[in-house]
Regions:
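C-terminal capping/lid segments that line or modulate ligand- or cofactor-binding pockets
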Residues: 206, 276-277, 477, 495, ...
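Alpha-helical support elements that line or immediately flank enzyme active sites
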Residues: 152, 156, 346-365, 404-407, ...
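Active-site acid/base region of carbohydrate-active enzymes
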Residues: 161, 255-262, 424-457, 463, ...
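Extracellular/oxidizing-compartment recognition motifs
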Residues: 2-86, 90-476, 483-484, 500-503, ...
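Non-catalytic C-terminal accessory modules of carbohydrate-active enzymes
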Residues: 230-239, 252-285, 310-320, 370, ...
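Beta-strand segments within the central parallel beta-sheet cores of soluble alpha/beta enzyme folds
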Residues: 104-109, 155, 205-208, 362, ...
Length: 867
C-alpha cells in the first residue's frame, strides 16, 4: 500500500480564516506515492469541537461519504451557521486502492453574518467637511476586564482607513484598511484575533486612528474623487467581543462613550501625502494609564450607506524592505536617495536635525537630467490641488527620530529629502514595499537573461499595482482601469495567489454596474468613466475574469454569481451596436506612437477601434454561451455570436484576400485570438502575421490589446521563435528599450512617455508559463484537472524551470540541455493528468502521451534550437 495523505485544507481559499460572511467552500490537496492515484470519494465533517470533527462526529454538518473526485470548493450544505462562531472541519478522502486519509482539523470563523451591529458609527466632532487640511482623528475607549480572557475578537470598519491599538500595540500588520470600494454600496470590515493583546488583568484601552483614504479624498483630480457620492469625514464602527474563561462575554462597542482628539498627523491625502508633527504626539494615547484630559466625546454619525461585509481578501502589508543603493547631497542642499527599484510603498525615515526642523520628502520614479531633483512633472498633472507625492515630518527633539507614514502609499524609486543636515550620522531612508499580501505561488526561471529581465519587470509592476484594487499605476492615477486588469489577470493568477484579490474587484465591478448594464472604465468609480472609455474592449473583463476564476477552480458557483451581471452588460453592448458593429471603446491603447502620453489620438490607431470592440462583443457572446452550458441554462448566445461574427467579417476581413482592416499586428492577432475564421483560414492568417512581424524587423507594433492577442496566438501556433525574436530586440519599441533607459518596471508607452510603472503589458509573463514552459489548460477542462505540457524545447534556452500552483498541487515543467540531448522533468499533481505535446524537432515516442499524477523524467534527442 502506498503513502496517501491530505496535505492542505482551505476554506474560501484561505487557511483557517477569521470572519466569513459567505457560504464556506472547502478545498483540500492530496499526495500519494502511487503514480496516477486519484480520489474516489470524500466526507466532510463540521463541528464546534476539533476532536469531534476529526473523529467523524459532524454534529453541525456531515456530508456523508460522497463518491467523486471533487476536492475544490465543495460548498457547506448544513444548517444555518451562527455569527461570530468558530467551526472545526475535517475531510476524509478515499483513493483508488480504498485507502482513507483524514486531514488534521482546520477551522473557520463566521463573521457578523446577518446579525445586527450593536455598535454605532462615530466620528470626532472637530472634523468638518469644508476643511482641506484634514488630519487624522484619534479615538479611544477604556474598559474593565472582569476575569481571565479566553478569546477576544475585534470587528472593525474605519473609513477611510483605520489602524487599531490595544494598550499601545497595533493589533495587526495590515495597512490601508479597508480596501477601496464604492463605499455607499459596499464597505468591508476586518476581524482581528486580539486575545494576546489584552492584559492579564485590570482595565484595557482600545485606540483607533482614522485616515481619510479614498473615503474622504478632498484632493481635486481628473476623476472627480472630491465629488464622490460617498464622501464624508472619517468614521468608525467597531465591536470588541471578549469571552472569559467562565463563558461569559462582554462587547465593547463604538458609541458616544468614546473620546476623540486631533493628533500628530496634521494632513493625509491618498493623492498628496502625509504630514506629521512629532511635537503634537500623544504618548501612550492608546494605553489605560493615559490621562485623556481635553479629549472630546465622540459624536454619532450616519454610516456609509452600503452593505457591510467581512473582508476575505488578503490585506495590504509591507512585504519587503529596500535599502538605498546610492545617496548624495545636491548643490541646493537636498539629499537624493536611490532605492534601486521602482516600487509602490512608503519609507521609514530616521530624521536628523534640531527640534522643530521640517523634513520634506518628495517621491518619484525618475530624476531630472542633472540629478538634482526628482522629476514629478510627467506624472503629476492629474492631481490638481496640493503637493504631489510629498510627505512632511517636523521633529520634536534634537536627537534621531524614526517615522513611517500611516495612511498613504507612493510609487517611486527616488526620494528627494529637504531639511536634513549636511552630514548624516547614520542610515536615513529605508524603502518599504507595500502590496496586497498574496503569496507568490508561480515561478518561472530560465538561463536566458533577457527573459528573466522581462519577468522581473512584470513582477515589480504587478505587485506595485495590487493595492486592494488592480491599479494602472501607483502614482499618477492609482485607478483600477478595467482594460488593464482584463489584460493581466491571467498572469496574476499564474504568478500569485490572486484569486481573492481579483474576486473582490469583480464584486466592485458588479456594485458599479448601472441598471442599463453599463460599467465604468475605472472601478471603483465616483461616476466618472460611464460615458467614455467603457467600450467592449475595456469592459470585457466583466466576462473574462469570472471565466478565468472558474478555469482556475472549477467552481461553477463563481459563474452563477456573476452570470446576471455579464448578461446585463451584454445587453448594454447590444444596445450600442449598429448592424452588429460596436464602436465606442478606447482601442489598442499605447501602440507605438510619437509624442507624450495621454496625447494618443484614437483615429491614428492602425487597428480600427470598431474591429477590436466588435471582436470583444463577439467573445462575450461566445463565453456567455459556454457559461450557459456549464450552468445548465438555455443558451441564446451561440446564435447571437454567429450574427456578430458575420457582421465583423463583412466589415473588416476581405473575403478574397483574407486581409484584415488595419493590416497590422493587432488586427491580425485580434481576428485570430477571437477565432473568427475557419481553422484553415486562421492558420493562413497566422502565417501572414509571422511574416508581417519579420518584415517589421521583429519589432513590436501593438498596444495593450495586441499584446495579448499577438503573443498568445503565436504561442498557440508554436511560434515561440517569433515571440523570442520580438522580446529580445534591444531598440525601440520593445521591453529591452525600456531596460536600456533605466526602467526596473514596465512602462506605459513604448517611447517612455508617461508612467514608468504600468503593468498593462505584463501578459507576456503568462506567455512564459503557457507557451515557453508549456503549462496551460487542455481545452475547457477547469482547475487543471487535465492540462497540457507543451514545452518550447526548440528554443535556444539551456535550462528552464517553471511551476504553477493548481488547486490539486504543484505543476512543474523544466528542462536541461546538454548538446543535442535534453532532459525534461514534469510534476503532475495527485488526481490530475497531463497531455504531452512536443515540438517537431524533438525525437520522442512519448509525444502525445497522457501522464498521470507523479514525477516524470525523460531524456530525448533534440534538433538545433531556434531563436
Amino acid at each position: 500500500m502506498g503513502c496517501f495523505k491530505i496535505v492542505q485544507c482551505t476554506c474560501n481559499h484561505q487557511e483557517n480564516p477569521l470572519g466569513l460572511d459567505r457560504t464556506p467552500r472547502f478545498g483540500w490537496k492530496m499526495r500519494s506515492d502511487t503514480r496516477g492515484d486519484a480520489q474516489t470519494a470524500y466526507r466532510i465533517t463540521v463541528s464546534t469541537d476539533a476532536r469531534r470533527a476529526q473523529a467523524g462526529q459532524g454534529d453541525v454538518w456531515d456530508s456523508g461519504q460522497t463518491a467523486g473526485d471533487e476536492n475544490v470548493s465543495v460548498a457547506y450544505a448544513g444548517p444555518p451557521l451562527q455569527p461570530r462562531t468558530r467551526y472545526y472541519w475535517c475531510v476524509t478522502a478515499w483513493n483508488r486502492a480504498g485507502e482513507a486519509a483524514v486531514s488534521r482539523p482546520a477551522f473557520f470563523e463566521t463573521g457578523k453574518l446577518n446579525e445586527a451591529w450593536r455598535a454605532r458609527w462615530i466620528t470626532a466632532p472637530f472634523l468638518k467637511m469644508d476643511k482641506t487640511d484634514t488630519g487624522a482623528p484619534y479615538l479611544r475607549r477604556t474598559f474593565p476586564l472582569r476575569g481571565e480572557v479566553r478569546s477576544a475578537r475585534l470587528y472593525i470598519c474605519g473609513l477611510g482607513y483605520h489602524e487599531a491599538f490595544i494598550e499601545g500595540k497595533k493589533v495587526s500588520e495590515n495597512l490601508l484598511e479597508p480596501a477601496f470600494t464604492k463605499y455607499d454600496a459596499l464597505s468591508y470590515y476586518r476581524v482581528y484575533d486580539v486575545t494576546e493583546h489584552l492584559p492579564a488583568a485590570g482595565p484595557a484601552t482600545l485606540g483607533v486612528a482614522l485616515g481619510n483614504g479614498w473615503y474622504n479624498c478632498f484632493t481635486e483630480d481628473a476623476w472627480n474623487i472630491r465629488q464622490a457620492s460617498w464622501r464624508a469625514v472619517p468614521k468608525l464602527l467597531c465591536e470588541l467581543y471578549i469571552t472569559y474563561a467562565d463563558g461569559t462575554q462582554d462587547c465593547i462597542c463604538s458609541d458616544t462613550g468614546w473620546k476623540t482628539s486631533p493628533g500628530p498627523i496634521t494632513f493625509n491625502s491618498i493623492r498628496n501625502g502625509e504630514w506629521y508633527d512629532a511635537r503634537l504626539e500623544l504618548p501612550g494615547w492608546s494605553e489605560s494609564t493615559y490621562g485623556a484630559d481635553g479629549w472630546q466625546d465622540a459624536e454619532l454619525v450616519r454610516g456609509a450607506g452600503g452593505v457591510l461585509r467581512a473582508a476575505e481578501m488578503q490585506p495590504i502589508r509591507v512585504m519587503q524592505e529596500l535599502a538605498p543603493v546610492n545617496a548624495y547631497r545636491t548643490q541646493e542642499g537636498r539629499w537624493i536617495f536611490d532605492l534601486g527599484q521602482n516600487f509602490a510603498g512608503k519609507v521609514r525615515l530616521t530624521a536628523y536635525g534640531p527640534a522643530g526642523s521640517e523634513i520634506v520628502l518628495r517621491y518619484c520614479e525618475d530624476l531630472t537630467g542633472d540629478g538634482q531633483h526628482v522629476e514629478q512633472k510627467h506624472i503629476s498633472g492629474f492631481v490638481r490641488t496640493g503637493e504631489f507625492q510629498t510627505d512632511k515630518y517636523i521633529k520634536k527633539s534634537d536627537g534621531p527620530e524614526e517615522w513611517t507614514p500611516q495612511f498613504v502609499y507612493h510609487g517611486f524609486r527616488y526620494v528627494e529629502a529637504e531639511g536634513l543636515p549636511e552630514e548624516l550620522p547614520g542610515p536615513c531612508i529605508m524603502g518599504l514595499v507595500m502590496h496586497t499580501s498574496f503569496e507568490r505561488t508561480g515561478h518561472f526561471e530560465c538561463s536566458d537573461d533577457t527573459l528573466m529581465t522581462i519577468q522581473r519587470l512584470c513582477h515589480w509592476s504587478s505587485i506595485s499595482n495590487c493595492q486592494g484594487v488592480p491599479t494602472d499605476c501607483p502614482h499618477r492615477e492609482k485607478n483600477a482601469w478595467t482594460g488593464d486588469a482584463g489584460t493581466v489577470h491571467d498572469q496574476l493568477l499564474l504568478n500569485y495567489d490572486a484569486f481573492l484579490f481579483l474576486e473582490k474587484w469583480l464584486d466592485d465591478l458588479c456594485q458599479s454596474q448601472r441598471p442599463n448594464g453599463s460599467i465604468p472604465c475605472v472601478c471603483p468609480s465616483t461616476g466618472w468613466g460611464y460615458n467614455w472609455g467603457n467600450g467592449p474592449d475595456w469592459s470585457m473583463v466583466l466576462t473574462t475574469l469570472p471565466w478565468a476564476l472558474y478555469e482556475q477552480t472549477g467552481d461553477a458557483a463563481i459563474l452563477a454569481r456573476y452570470y446576471p451581471f455579464i448578461c446585463r452588460h451584454f445587453d448594454f453592448m447590444s444596445s450600442m451596436a449598429v448592424d452588429g458593429i460596436v464602436n465606442y471603446g478606447i482601442g489598442d491603447w499605447c501602440a507605438p506612437f510619437d509624442g507624450p502620453a495621454i496625447s494618443v489620438n484614437m483615429s491614428t490607431f492602425k487597428a480600427p477601434v470598431a474591429l477590436t470592440d466588435t471582436a470583444c462583443y463577439y467573445r462575450s457572446a461566445r463565453m456567455l454561451s459556454k457559461m450557459s452550458r456549464v450552468l445548465g441554462l438555455d443558451d441564446p448566445y451561440l446564435a447571437r455570436s454567429e450574427e456578430i461574427r458575420a457582421a465583423l467579417l463583412r466589415n473588416f476581413v476581405d473575403a478574397d484576400t483574407g486581409e484584415v482592416a488595419g493590416a497590422c499586428q493587432t488586427s491580425d492577432g485580434c481576428v485570430a485570438f477571437h477565432h473568427l475564421l475557419k481553422p484553415q483560414e486562421e492558420a493562413r492568417l497566422m502565417e501572414r502575421l509571422a511574416e508581417r512581424i519579420a518584415q517589421n524587423g521583429w519589432h513590436i507594433d501593438y498596444g495593450i490589446l495586441g499584446s495579448k492577442y499577438v503573443l498568445n496566438m503565436l504561442g498557440e501556433y508554436g511560434r515561440t521563435d517569433v515571440i523570442y525574436k520580438m522580446l529580445t530586440r534591444e531598440d525601440y519599441p520593445g521591453y529591452l528599450y525600456w531596460v536600456a533607459h533605466g526602467c526596473t518596471t514596465l512602462a506605459e508607452c513604448w517611447n517612455l512617455g508617461g508612467s514608468h510603472n504600468h503593468y498593462m503589458f505584463s501578459d507576456v509573463s503568462a506567455v512564459f508559463y503557457r507557451y515557453f514552459a508549456g503549462i496551460r489548460p487542455d481545452g475547457d477542462i477547469p482547475a487543471y484537472r487535465s492540462f497540457l505540457l507543451a514545452p518550447a524545447l526548440d528554443l535556444a534556452i539551456d535550462t528552464l524551470s517553471c511551476s504553477v500552483e493548481s488547486p490539486h498541487g504543484t505543476i512543474f515543467a523544466g528542462w536541461k540541455k546538454d548538446g543535442d540531448t535534453v532532459t525534461f522533468t514534469a510534476g503532475v499533481p495527485f488526481g490530475t493528468t497531463a497531455r504531452l505535446r512536443l515540438p517537431a524537432g524533438v525525437q520522442a515516442p512519448e509525444n502525445g502521451a497522457v501522464l498521470g499524477g507523479g514525477r516524470h523524467e525523460f531524456c530525448w534527442k533534440i534538433a538545433q534550437s531556434a531563436g
